[in-house]
């Protein structure tokens, strides 16, 4: 993929001292999510802090995905990447979407950016629960996100706890549409899809647009605890006021956090500098990416399936965040 110059990103405040004379320049390739998405903007802001503090650093930011980023780190194609905690757990265990454990990965920081699973049906579908789909063998027409996406995987994990598979849905006469979220939203608007699924932070613009045209219902996840234990998701809740009150009531679901992972063979000094830039430049980062405001140094070092990089651990311990 084409590497994008960080000089195009918003200029941020200089932090830290210049790199000492004689030290090796920092050279990094960073993989985020889609261009202009939350992780792309947030990781871009962190990379800009590094280039500001170390003018001779060579840092490139490229788009990526939850599934491809761990493999790129294992293959030494990238040095640091954004990753959801639940997919990191799959990488550690070697479970779907991976065929075996993914190596050469350590954690840098848990950003604790909340991404909740939206399971949304048209109100006129008559569907009120996931249990009802199983009991009545409803021929569900569902858009669970692109094939292999974290949205589809999380949705499948939830369905499996209810004793439902995608093959079951097809056997009952339903259809699985792995179109992009915009297409599926349009299909739901036209009555071609009963359910739209999305895992992400806040209110997705396409769901906001859909809710303005079609009455919707968010289905609760009652099997959240079982899913959490297996896949390192957590039990979350949508406030009733979301989507201009269309949510109607607080609705239980599952969610995941965003984290930063790095190569295991990254030098301790580089991992230390990345952690320092993130922690000491926090205000600059969240100015560029408000969704990362959940990040705090006090909690950044735990809650991740991969062990912490020794360089990051050194910073957290030096500053007293980690005892």
PLM feature segments, named:
Residues 27-53, 57-58, 116-186, 190, ...:
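Bilobed "Venus flytrap"/periplasmic-binding protein-like clamshell domains
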Residues 41-74, 246-250:
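Extracytoplasmic small-molecule ligand-binding "clamshell" domains
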Residues 1-4:
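Positively charged n-region of N-terminal signal peptides that target proteins for export
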Residues 190, 195, 200-211, 218, ...:
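An extracytoplasmic/periplasmic, membrane-proximal ligand-sensing/linker region
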Residues 85-87, 95-97, 103, 125, ...:
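Pocket-lining segment of extracytoplasmic ligand-binding domains
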Residues 17-23:
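Sec/Tat signal peptide C-region and signal peptidase I cleavage site
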Residues 74-116:
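N-terminal segment of the mature folded domain
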Residues 7-16:
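Bacterial N-terminal signal peptides
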